[in-house]
């Protein structure tokens, strides 16, 4: 085999690998999924937040494990029924969406069985440019193909102070509980 043929064959193999990797990611369906959070005030009121705009996928890695990759729009975050809290949440004292327009999460690689059986899923959460390891708890699935036939449901509690979201301590709890209900577009499970 000539050097030219080896280079051409290598390029063809690399192209095939890249194509198969792209085909192995299941996009998160924004019409059938929801990503939000709750936050308690010091007076006992629960504020319910929603990320109506986000991008995400569940990638199938070469070793057969999966990985969640999410980008949530902090610019579009909403607090249900309260425009004042919506404005404050997007502002400098909370997400500071003008400077940090996204909240990112990349999970650790995990076996597909985790979404069926439930369990803990670690990963890197980035808020306001601060990246920290956090753990979310996946609930056991109520169907055979989670993400396709039923939601994958996960939740996790983070301390907002760890991300520089430390204003309004007199009025807001430091704990923020994120909740995700996820379905995929591609028809591939999570």
Explain the meaning of each model-derived region.
Residues 3-7:
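N-terminal export leaders
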Residues 8-9, 186:
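Intrinsically disordered, low-complexity segments enriched in polar/charged small residues
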Residues 10-21:
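Bacterial N-terminal signal peptides
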Residues 24-190:
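Low-complexity, acidic/polar, glycine-enriched regions of mature
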């Amino acid at each position: 085999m000539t050097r030219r043929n080896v280079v051409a064959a290598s390029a063809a193999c690399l192209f095939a690998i890249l194509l198969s990797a792209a085909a192995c990611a299941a996009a998160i369906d924004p019409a059938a999924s929801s990503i939000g959070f709750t936050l308690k005030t010091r007076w006992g009121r629960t504020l319910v937040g929603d990320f109506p705009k986000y991008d995400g996928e569940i990638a199938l890695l070469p070793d057969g494990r999966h990985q969640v990759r999410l980008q949530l729009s902090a610019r579009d975050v909403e607090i249900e029924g309260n425009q004042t809290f919506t404005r404050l949440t997007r502002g400098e004292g909370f997400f500071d969406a003008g400077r940090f327009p996204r909240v990112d999460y990349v999970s650790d690689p995990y076996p597909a069985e985790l979404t069926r059986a439930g369990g803990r899923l670690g990963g890197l959460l980035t808020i306001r440019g601060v990246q920290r390891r956090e753990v979310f708890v996946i609930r056991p699935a109520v169907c055979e193909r989670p993400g396709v036939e039923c939601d994958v449901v996960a939740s996790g509690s983070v301390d907002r102070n760890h991300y520089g979201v430390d204003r309004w301590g007199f009025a807001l709890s430091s704990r923020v509980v994120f909740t995700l209900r996820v379905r995929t577009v591609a028809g591939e499970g999570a």
